[in-house]
Amino acid sequence: MRDLKTYLSVAPVVSTIWFGALAGLLIEINRLFPDALVFPFFSF
């Protein structure tokens, strides 16, 4: 039961950090390449 409580207290923290980092990354990509449907560094 203690392990379950530990898991339930860790999972929201990890997911909040993960989604915050992902949102920050998407915001920075959209700041550098606004309205980009195809990113310039993917086209060769």
From Swiss-Prot:
UniProt similarity note: Belongs to the PsaJ family.
Q: Which GO terms describe its biological process?
A: photosynthesis
Q: Could you tell me which InterPro entries the record lists for this protein? A: PSI_PsaJ (IPR002615), PSI_PsaJ_sf (IPR036062)
Q: Where in the cell is it found?
A: Plastid, Chloroplast thylakoid membrane
SUPFAM superfamilies linked to this entry? Subunit IX of photosystem I reaction centre, PsaJ (SSF81544)
Q: What is this protein called?
A: Photosystem I reaction center subunit IX
Explain the purpose of this protein. Answer: May help in the organization of the PsaE and PsaF subunits.
How this chain sits in the membrane, per its record, is: Single-pass membrane protein
Which keywords does UniProt give here?
A: Chloroplast, Membrane, Photosynthesis, Photosystem I, Plastid, Thylakoid, Transmembrane, Transmembrane helix
HAMAP family from the entry? PSI_PsaJ (MF_00522)
Q: Where are the transmembrane segments?
A: 7-27
What's a Pfam family this protein contains?
PSI_PsaJ
Q: Which GO terms describe its cellular component?
A: chloroplast thylakoid membrane; photosystem I
